[in-house]
């Protein structure tokens, strides 16, 4: 027993393996990234068997199984000691799989090889939980032959997860797999309710390690820290930038990319978002695009992490917003005026509640409902999209209120910008890891780290397993390692990391680069005759790009990431508080346009101008308050790239 425990401990202490993290050798050009992010070939029929075989279990004294791999799932049927008439839990959808690896026994006399899959199925209460399953390849007399069979299955499964084609009649070997992508993770450790770093460490990092992705990680420390970093980033060394926070951090990243002299190349860098903030609108849209049911909190994070592990980019529209002072910024989400922006900014003091702050802010806003006089002008879309009334309403997300964290002790530091620091959680601020860092992240145990499913799912055995040394990146060996925090100074970032050294005079203001707004005349000048103008008293005006205004608010249910449209929604004065509340309740299902509210208006546009005529008010861009006054905006279709998972992956959940 002592030997077994010691072996398991040694397994957890195995050294990091080098993750080069590229989709090919040499610098990463836009062409290389485009090929890597290209949509996969048309999928095979979901029921077409790709592989079939008989395997044992781990430990060896367990039952035996017949495995069948299709393009959508791994089918498992127990053969011995007692065949199953009706297999229970014998279907593992690939939509729930983060990755797989091959393993070998530490016993020299064991000629079997093993492959392990990492899954995140839903439990009885609907929440996801991590589970592993390990299968024993023992049909051949030698370890080399059994290892080849285990690698064949692991390679085929990985190809399906990443949308890579399998050879029709060719041999399936690890050579089919490209080198793993290298991601830069930017984490706001105080995001949302102060859980961002905890969730990143406990859920995100293990999952992307299981997927075999290479990553480096840095925690943001101040306002516009992320913007400064990406402004000087060596883009050729990275295949994607992923923010672990709310919508505000991605706003900084995109504006930093567009503020570079090489913005035309920089804006094509794939970006992703893993929701750990209080405002997770884009993540809600990604979740819906991936086919998952609406979710909040940790469940939404796990859904988006699964999609990130699958890879795959999607064109992303970006809105260029010119403010009254002439400065310009870029939006991927929304421009709001009136009730929505009032709630967003005035609910700041309730940020510790997470997304529930908006519910409370809405109730308080209804109690003091204001109207604003203004003028909205827009250039109608050349081709109008389908009616904004959805064919059917979307299901509501489960409540996040049960995920309230323990209160964190206060920390003595100056307040930071809302997109950088939301709660004073006392956590270290490590710098980005360099290759060969001596302090690796905790290694995942082979058969645990999370709850196991009951029954035939793998458990600890008498002969612990170790990673197959011939595989490029077994799970649990992330390249990212966290340095000790640097006191009172800027983090030391090695030149090999591909990151710029932060400088005090880095530009953090409005963007001076980016595409020209050829549809917009200068602010204050007359608009062309083909524009439509509305003037009057409004309760709110919202210009939104994706479908979601919040993780559980579907403001434009028909919107797509690359439809080239800005979706204008407004509510005129005269609406009652009860009717406005009904609109927002219906927005949780995306059915608010079907209520027939006479004050609710909608238009699809390519550009718009908003001129507030009320002397006081609040304007927000992507949830961030901007200067109050006239503004105008133009949509630039598909100039960005968003990591969303492969098209059509996964199918709508049952």
From Swiss-Prot:
GO terms (molecular function) for this protein are: ATP binding; D-erythro-sphingosine kinase activity; histone binding; lipid kinase activity; small GTPase binding; sphingosine kinase activity; sphingosine-1-phosphate receptor activity
The compartments listed are: Cytoplasm; Nucleus; Endoplasmic reticulum; Mitochondrion inner membrane
Q: Spans of biased composition, class Gly residues?
A: 447-461
Question: Which residues does UniProt mark as catalytic?
Answer: 247 (proton donor/acceptor)
Start-end of Low complexity biased regions: 462-482
Every DAGKc domain range: 178-325
Q: Please tell me whether the keyword Glycoprotein is annotated for this protein.
A: no
As its record notes, the protein acts as a catalyst of: a sphingoid base + ATP = a sphingoid 1-phosphate + ADP + H(+); sphing-4-enine + ATP = sphing-4-enine 1-phosphate + ADP + H(+); sphinganine + ATP = sphinganine 1-phosphate + ADP + H(+); (4R)-hydroxysphinganine + ATP = (4R)-hydroxysphinganine 1-phosphate + ADP + H(+)
Which tissues carry this protein?
A: Mainly expressed in adult kidney, liver, and brain. Expressed in cerebral cortex and hippocampus (at protein level). Isoform 1 is the predominant form expressed in most tissues.
Please give an example of a GO cellular component term from this record: nucleosome
| Disulphide bond pairs | none
Q: Which UniProt keywords apply?
A: ATP-binding, Cytoplasm, Endoplasmic reticulum, Kinase, Lipid metabolism, Lysosome, Membrane, Mitochondrion, Mitochondrion inner membrane, Nucleotide-binding, Nucleus, Phosphoprotein, Transferase
Q: How is its activity regulated?
A: Inhibited by sulfatide. Kinase activity is increased by phosphorylation by MAPK2 upon PMA or EGF treatments.
Give the Enzyme Commission number: 2.7.1.91
Mutagenesis / variant outcome for changing residue 437 to A: Reduces phosphorylation levels
Q: Where is the composition biased (Basic and acidic residues)?
A: 1-17
The region called Required for binding to sulfatide and phosphoinositides and for membrane localizatione is annotated at 1-175
* Positions bearing Phosphoserine: 387, 393, 399, 419, 421, 477
**Chief localization:** cytoplasm
Ligand binding (substrate)? 245-248, 344
Which residue stretches belong to region Disordered?
1-28, 400-509
Q: How does it assemble?
A: Interacts with histone H3. Interacts with HDAC1, HDAC2, MBD2 and SIN3A. Interacts with EEF1A1; the interaction enhances SPHK2 kinase activity. Interacts with PHB2.
Q: What is the protein name given in its UniProt record?
A: Sphingosine kinase 2
Q: Which organism is it from?
A: Homo sapiens (Human)
As recorded in Swiss-Prot or TrEMBL, the protein's gene is named SPHK2
């Amino acid at each position: 027993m002592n030997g077994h425990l010691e072996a398991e401990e040694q397994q957890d202490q195995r050294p990091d393996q080098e993750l080069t993290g590229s989709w090919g050798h040499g610098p990463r050009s836009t062409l290389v990234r485009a090929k890597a992010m290209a949509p996969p070939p048309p999928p095979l029929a979901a029921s077409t068997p790709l592989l079939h075989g008989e395997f044992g279990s781990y430990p060896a004294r367990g039952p035996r199984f017949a495995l069948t791999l299709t393009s959508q799932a791994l089918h498992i049927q127990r053969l011995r000691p007692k065949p199953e008439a009706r297999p229970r839990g014998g279907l593992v959808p690939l939509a729930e799989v983060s990755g797989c690896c091959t393993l070998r026994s530490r016993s020299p006399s064991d000629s079997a090889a093993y492959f392990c899959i990492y899954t995140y199925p839903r439990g009885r209460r609907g929440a996801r939980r991590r589970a592993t399953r390990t299968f024993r390849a023992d049909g051949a007399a030698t370890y080399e032959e059994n290892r080849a069979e285990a690698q064949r299955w692991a390679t085929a499964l990985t190809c399906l997860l990443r949308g890579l084609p399998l050879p029709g009649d060719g041999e399936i070997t690890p050579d089919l797999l490209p080198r793993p992508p290298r991601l830069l993770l930017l984490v706001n450790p105080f995001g949302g309710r102060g859980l961002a770093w905890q969730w990143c460490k406990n859920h995100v990092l293990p999952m992307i390690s299981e997927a075999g992705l290479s990553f480096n990680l840095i925690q943001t420390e101040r306002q516009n820290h992320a913007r400064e970093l990406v402004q000087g980033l060596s883009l050729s060394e990275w295949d994607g930038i992923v923010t672990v926070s709310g919508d505000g951090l991605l706003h900084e990243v995109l504006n930093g990319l567009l503020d570079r002299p090489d913005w035309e190349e920089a804006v094509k860098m794939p970006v992703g978002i893993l929701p750990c903030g209080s405002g997770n609108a884009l993540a809600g849209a990604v979740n819906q695009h991936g086919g998952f049911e609406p979710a909040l909190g940790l469940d939404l994070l796990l859904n988006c992490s699964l999609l990130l592990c699958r890879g795959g980019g999607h064109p992303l529209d970006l809105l260029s917003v010119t403010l009254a002072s002439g400065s310009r910024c870029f939006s991927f989400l929304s421009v709001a005026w009136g009730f929505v922006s009032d709630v967003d900014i005035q609910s700041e003091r309730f940020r510790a509640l997470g997304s529930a702050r908006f519910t409370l802010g809405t109730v308080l806003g209804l109690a003091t409902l204001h109207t604003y006089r203004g003028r909205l002008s827009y250039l109608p879309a050349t081709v109008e999209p389908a009616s904004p009334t959805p064919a059917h309403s979307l299901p509501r997300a489960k409540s996040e209120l049960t995920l309230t964290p323990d209160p964190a002790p206060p920390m003595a530091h100056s307040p930071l910008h809302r997109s950088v620091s939301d709660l004073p959680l006392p956590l270290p601020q490590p710098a980005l890891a360099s290759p060969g860092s001596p302090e690796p992240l905790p290694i995942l145990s082979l058969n645990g780290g999370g709850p196991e499913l009951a029954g035939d799912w793998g458990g600890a055995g008498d002969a612990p397993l170790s990673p197959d040394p011939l595989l490029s990146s077994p799970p649990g060996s992330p390249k990212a390692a966290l340095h000790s925090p640097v006191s009172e100074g800027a983090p030391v970032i090695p030149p090999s990391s591909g990151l710029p050294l932060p400088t005090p005079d880095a530009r953090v203001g409005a963007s001076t680069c980016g595409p020209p707004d050829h549809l917009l005349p200068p602010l204050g000048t007359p608009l062309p005759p083909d524009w439509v103008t509305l003037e009057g008293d409004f309760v709110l005006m919202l210009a939104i790009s994706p479908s979601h205004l919040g993780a559980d608010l579907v403001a434009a249910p028909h919107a797509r990431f690359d439809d080239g449209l800005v979706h204008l929604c407004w509510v005129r004065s005269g609406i009652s508080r009860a009717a406005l509340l009904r609109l927002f309740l219906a927005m949780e299902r995306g059915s608010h346009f079907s209520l027939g509210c006479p004050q609710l208006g909608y238009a699809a546009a390519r550009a718009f101008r908003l001129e507030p005529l009320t002397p006081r008010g609040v304007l927000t861009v992507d949830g961030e308050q901007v200067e109050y006054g006239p503004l105008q905006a133009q949509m630039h279709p598909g100039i960005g790239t968003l990591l969303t998972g492969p098209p059509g992956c996964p199918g709508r959940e049952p």
